Amino acid sequence: MRMKKFFNEWKWVILAGFLLLVFAFCIRFYNLTLLPVFADEAIYIRWSQVMNAEPTLRFLPLSDGKQPLFMWILMFFINKVSNPLFAGRIISVFSGIGTLIGIFAVSYLLFKNKLVSLLSVLIWAICPLSFFFDRMALVDSMMTMFGVWTLFFGILTTKTKRLDMALIAGFCFGCGMLTKSPAIFFLLLLPVTWILVKKPKDLIKVIPLFVVVTVVGYGMYNILRLGPNFNMIASRNQDYVLPISRIWTYPTDPLIPHFIDVFVKWFPKMGPWPIFALILFGLSASWKKYWREKVIIVISWLGPLVILAEFGRAFTVRYILFTFPVLFILMASGILVKNKIIKSLFYLFLFLFIGTSLVFDYHLLTNPAKANLPRSERSGYLEEWTAGDGIKEVAEYLKSEELKNPNKKIVVGTEGFFGTLPDGLQIYLNRNPKIIVIGVGLNLNEVPESLLESKIAGNKTYLVINKSRLKVDSDKLGLELIASYNKSPRKDINSSEYINNGPQEVLLFFELK
C-alpha cells in the first residue's frame, strides 16, 4: 500500500524529472568537442595521460599546486577513448548531472515542494552559466557537484542528528577538497544549517556531528601528503588570494569591480537577464514560512561570492560556479508566491528566462562565436592564445606525415612550455611516440636552436605558434607555412589585444625548410 501511495503521489514527478535529466544530458553531450581545447583543459588532460603511463607520478598535479581527483578519475579511461578532449569533458557532463540531482534533493529537503524541485532542475539544465561549464574538462563542475551533496547531507545531519549522515557529508566535503581548494567554503557554510535546529539543546548533539564532518573531510584531504609537493597547494593558493590585511586600506577594491563583473557583465549575458527578476521573486515568496531555508540559501550564495570578490586576485565566472546551485533553488522558490498578479509576473519572467537561455545554448551547441559571452569568457575560450583552434587539425596532419614517413622522426616545436601549447598538441599525439613535441618559448625572433639542430639531424621539423607570438617575418626565418587557423574575431576594439595584435588571432603551422 505504501509503495502504491508513493507511486501515485510521485509518478508525474519521476516522469518529469527523468525527462529533464535526459534532456540535460543530451544537450550537454551534443557537439561536446565543438569548442576548441582550452589552456587548463589541455593541462589537466595531459597530466592524466602522464599519470596513466607512469604510476610514480600519480600526484603530478601537486607540482603546480592543484588537487588531483579530477585527473585520478580521468586517467583510468583516458586511453580507452579516441578523443582525449571528449574523455575529459564527459566527466564534467556527468558531474553536471550529479549536481542536477543534488539540486533536486536539496530543494525538496528545504521546501518539501515538488514544483520547486523540478523548476530548480530545469533552471540548472538550461542556464548558460551552468550549461557552459558542464561541457568543459575543468574541475569546477565536479567541485560544484560535491558542494551540493555536502550541503544536502549537512542539512540531513542537522535535521536527523545521525552519525551516518555526518560521515557521508564528510566524504562529500573530502572529495571536494581533493578537487579544488575553494571547497573549504562547503565546510565553512555548514554551520548555517544550524538555523534549522528549533531547540537550543539539540545543538549539543549537532555540533559534535559537524566535528565528524571536518575530521572525515580533512582526513581524506591529507591523503595528498603521500605525494611530493603537498606544500605547493598552499603556495599556489596565495597566487589567487589577496592578503586579509588589505581590507583595512582598500575595503572596496576589488570588491566593487568584481561585483560589477558579476551583476553588470556576467549575469545580464550568461544569466541571462531575467535572472534578476527571478531572484527577487524567490527572495519575497513565502518568506515568513520559509525564512530559515532562505537564510541558508542566501548565505550559501552570497557568503562565498562576497569573500571571493573581496579577496580574489583572479575572478572569472567559473570560479563562482559552485555558488549557483543554491541561487537557482532560490529562483525556483519564486513559484511559491501567493499573489496572483505577482505569480503571473513570475511566470512571464520564467518564460523569458527559458527562451533566452535556450537561444544562448543553441549558439553554444552550433556556433559558439555567436553566443553572447562576456568579454572575459569570449577572450579566453574563443579569441586568444588560450583557445586551441587548429590544434587538433595540426595533430591529424602530423599523424598522416608519420604514416607517409615511417622511418623518420618528427619534431614539433610549439610556443610556450605549459598550457594550450604544447600540452594541447601532446594530448592528441600521446599514442604517437615518434612525434616529439617540445615547447620553445614565447615571442620568437628567430628559429630556436633546438629546432635547427633537429632539422640538421634529418628530422621533419615543424613550428606551431600564434601570430601574436611570432615577432619577425616568417619568410626571413626559412619557414614554410603549411596551414593557418583563424580564431574568433576580437570583438572589443578597445582591448589591449586588439590594439597590439589586430582584429584576429591566428594559429600558424610551419615546416622548417
Predicted segments with their positions:
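Short helix- or helix-capping micro-motifs
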Residues: 21-24, 120-125, 173, 177, ...
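Membrane-proximal, lumen/periplasm-facing interface regions of secretory-pathway glyco-
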Residues: 351-400, 416-424, 500-504
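Transmembrane-lumen/periplasm boundary regions of multi-pass, lipid-linked membrane glycan transferases
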Residues: 44, 49-50, 175, 186-293, ...
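Specific aromatic-rich, kink-prone transmembrane helix
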Residues: 102, 123, 142-159, 165-173, ...
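Membrane-interface transmembrane helices that cradle and orient dolichyl/undecaprenyl
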Residues: 3, 108-114, 150-166, 176, ...
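Transmembrane-helix motifs of polytopic, lipid-linked glycan transferases
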Residues: 86, 90-111, 149, 153, ...
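Aromatic/acidic, Gly/Pro-rich catalytic loop(s) in extracytoplasmic/lumenal soluble domains
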Residues: 433-513
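Short acidic/glycine- and proline-prone juxtamembrane loop motifs at membrane-interface regions
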Residues: 38-39, 92, 129-143, 316
